[in-house]
Amino acid sequence: MNSIPMAEHMRHIMRGDWEGVAALLLASAEKVAGAGASFAIWPDNTCHQAFKYLLPKSPIQWIHIAEAVAAEALRLGFKRLGVLGTRYLMESSVYPDAMARHNIDCAIPEADDREKINTIIFKQLVNGQFPEESRLYFNEVMDGLKGRGCDAAVLGCTEIPLIVRPDDAPLPTLDSTRLLAKAALHRALST
């Protein structure tokens, strides 16, 4: 296992430097490959925007987080997913591209909701703060996505499942981090 401090990849993300993010992930892949790993995962959804620069250079295969989500969405029969995550992720092609390969549609919250979700993630959730009003706000956003035809919501940030409760969410939830972990476990046990 190799971990990159969030501050290191965030400085690249904030500049839109996906090649810089890819360089960090490549260095990590080289370390774990050198230790004998046959594949790698990265549980940060937003960083998957760097995969187009990373994959051609990586010494080992990677499991893409959105592909793990797509597999579960297919298994459960979902056709249109609402994507929640950082603003960088929601406004990217990470989920739309992966879902399109499986004939699944995606929607994202409106611009003001994306900004507020991003603020909640970076000002509250990453700092261990989980106010009830923020939890209810996520439910409101999911209810809006449901009204736009979504039949499930992607929890596309490692911190979102810490505040969203699947038992009272307006939509079924797909926890991307858990689904990536399950995909990694499945691959590890089948090799």
Per-region residue spans from a language model:
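Non-catalytic structural scaffold of enzyme domains
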Residues: 1-191
